[in-house]
């Protein structure tokens, strides 16, 4: 919650707490599953389905990709509870029909912030520093 308090000190977005169906799916405790929760919220898919899908996607990426990133993940659990890498997130969103649109590029500095007047209307999955969240028509 401290993350959101710091974030909201500079934002004009309304805050709505939503676990994306995590508790209803029987999951308890804290987790780094912001990707699962965010995708469940924006797509309307169940938390459990998104969790299971991302588990498989994480495992597939780790075992089939020849990248340095995949090799470094060999020691890691495939569970989306402990995070999902951006490469896997983008691939999964594409399968669901979503388009990843970057607003920041190398060498350009930060031009878009979590402020209502800087974000387009509609439903967005927003990437912050080591976190993914949802903004829907000005509500975080």
Language model: regions and residue ranges:
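Conserved active-site-adjacent core of cysteine acyl-enzyme catalytic domains
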Residues: 61-130, 136-138
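Active-site nucleophile-adjacent alpha helix/oxyanion-hole segment immediately C-terminal to the catalytic cysteine
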Residues: 2-73, 87, 91, 95-98
């Amino acid at each position: 919650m401290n993350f959101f308090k710091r974030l909201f000190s500079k934002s004009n977005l309304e805050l709505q707490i939503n676990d994306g169906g995590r508790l209803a799916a029987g999951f308890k405790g804290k987790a780094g599953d912001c990707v699962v929760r965010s995708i469940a919220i924006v797509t309307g898919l169940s938390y459990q389905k998104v969790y299971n899908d991302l588990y498989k996607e994480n495992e597939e990426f780790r075992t089939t990709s020849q990248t340095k990133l995949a090799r470094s993940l060999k020691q890691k659990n495939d569970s989306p509870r402990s995070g999902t890498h951006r490469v896997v997130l983008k691939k999964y969103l594409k399968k669901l029909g979503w388009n990843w649109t970057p607003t920041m590029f190398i060498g350009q500095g930060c031009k878009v912030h979590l402020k209502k007047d800087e974000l387009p209307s509609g439903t967005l999955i927003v990437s912050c520093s080591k976190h993914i969240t949802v903004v829907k028509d000005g509500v975080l």
